[in-house]
Amino acid sequence: MILKMKRIDFENGSVTQNIFAAALPMLVAQILNLLYNIVDRIYIARIPHIGTAALGAVGLCFPLVVIITAFANLFGSGGAPLFSISRGQKKNKQAVHIMNTSFSMVCFSAVVLMLIGLLFARPLLILFGASNDALVYAFPYMMIYLIGTLPSMIAIGMNPFINAQGYSTIGMFSVAIGAIANLLLDPFFIFVLGFGVRGAAIATVISQCLSASFVLYFLTKKAELKVRFLHKNELSESLGYAKNIISLGTAGFIMQLTNSLVSIVCNNVLSVTGGDIYISVMTIISSVRQLVETPIYAMNEGGSPILSYNYGARRPARVRKAMIVMSAMILCYTAVMWSIIIFAPGTLIRVFSSDPSLVKDSVPALNQYFAAFIFMDLQYIGQTVFKSLNKKKHAIFFSLLRKVFIVIPLTYFMPYVLHMGTSGVFLAEPVSNVIGGGLCFVTMLCTVLPELRRMEDCD
């Protein structure tokens, strides 16, 4: 064994210790996973002569990366809470069927997405805001990245089922394999072999294959509940599970898909109001956001299986305690990071680029974009609780509200109607954080807490 397979007992022991035990390996995993997304950009930005232009071009591929991740999470993050609830109810056979259904849907959708992407890569990039100059770098990167769609989606979509069984350290290791490989392979392919932007994509695909191989090995050979493809005679029974998986996963799917839509809208408006340089600025802001959000995501994912398992086991006191601990951890962390962003933005920006003109334009944009980021925590906490407790309608509604009905309209309204230019694009985010995040969190408190009290009264 590479690692000792220590499991977390979601039903017993300290809730705080359980969340830390689940969240810390996930934090390491997510930090490493972040390398998949930002290491390419760091190295690409330092390619002699073309770094800034190539960075903006690769940033145009970000919506596609988000779409692929969104589909993986639709089936993975949609299935894992149902899997955990079934385990909490001691229905292991049902839990396995849910996992197998998720796995089959992950693989099928990956093949479909890869084929669509390869066929329509150029028009998609133009839709995302690519100019003819940007296509020179964005098109080859996207074509190579698409080849790794299947391993990428397996690694992302099935890792939650490792964590949901209490093997959070194994989940961390599965991400570490690919992330470390990517960190080592990127400079080799980009600079040593001289492949440039293409080299970054090749390194990423190889790394994704390594992660996916480990995830499949563990879930088919070592886990307590093992995964496989659905058999033909199981397809009809799986339709009900598939519907529930998609229903629950739709909230996170919408949240990620609308991230992609917002990115497309921002790039299109910025290309008109600020030119290609502001596409690069937005790429840096997106990278900083990923850097900041990674621990938040880890804390949410660390708390989610504990919420789901104890909700299924009808242990409302532990559900309530998990909500409080998870919320406190996230809010404290974000307060620290928000202070760094507001008072020392240049430090974070220079991680991705040392171009003086790019840094100069990025500093005010970063401050505007993150002005009310702490309110975004309220959205994350509310969404995680709704998803973990199988509250599909609430999760879906609040995913749509902030991005589709607040951010996107403001991204057009503030630059064009209020004549705020590029600042309007970046300020749309904090306005949506305050409105959307506040409404989501208050609704969560008003719906979930009374239900937990009723559960206590019944028991």
Predicted regions and their residues:
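Small-residue hotspots at the loop-to-helix junctions and early N-terminal turns
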Residues: 52-63, 138, 142, 201, ...
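Transmembrane helical elements of multi-pass membrane transporters/channels
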Residues: 21-40, 144, 178, 207-211, ...
